[in-house]
Amino acid sequence: MDRTAKADLVSTLNGVFTTNAVVVVAHYKGLTVADMQKLRSQMKQAGATVKVAKNRLASIALDGTDVASIKPLLKGPTLLAYSSDPVAAAKVAVDFAKTNDKLVILGGAMGTTALNPDGVKALATLPSLDELRAKLVGLIQAPATKVAQVVNAPAAKLARVFGAYAKKDEAA
């Protein structure tokens, strides 16, 4: 890799570190190519990305970013998983690590907050942004439907009363 390619990679990684909500660092020693492809496809489905980069270049790219706290984790064969959704990358990495013991989560960062492996696992248990949005919409819509039911209930009762009077008059 020549100097310009390295500079391009550093600027790309710097952009990744500044624009994404969460970065997870893990060791991948012993993962097969098939396992890595499976991890990449699962990340892609969740809206996250996995990148393997030289630790030295990733360390340079971390300078001046909010997630610079992950620098000490960049030792050995490390991969970086990141996403704009604060939960997606952590959730996929933790789920994959449960089924494949070769992927060892070292930690990560969410904004300026450094996360240890337990912090990443705790982050993975939280609902995603889409799930939270769906719950919020449901909570907002629930009172509106209840109001509509309450408003319509007296009208329905009135209609039944008038219907009963009409039947009574017809019978008489």
From Swiss-Prot:
The keyword rRNA-binding applies. Belongs to the universal ribosomal protein uL10 family. This is Large ribosomal subunit protein uL10. GO terms for molecular function: large ribosomal subunit rRNA binding; structural constituent of ribosome. The keyword Metal-binding does not apply. It comes from Methylorubrum populi (strain ATCC BAA-705 / NCIMB 13946 / BJ001) (Methylobacterium populi). GO terms for cellular component: large ribosomal subunit. Part of the ribosomal stalk of the 50S ribosomal subunit. The N-terminus interacts with L11 and the large rRNA to form the base of the stalk. The C-terminus forms an elongated spine to which L12 dimers bind in a sequential fashion forming a multimeric L10(L12)X complex. NCBIfam families: PRK00099.1-1. InterPro entries: Ribosomal_uL10, Ribosomal_uL10-like_sf, Ribosomal_uL10_bac, Ribosomal_uL10_bac_type, Ribosomal_uL10_CS_bac.
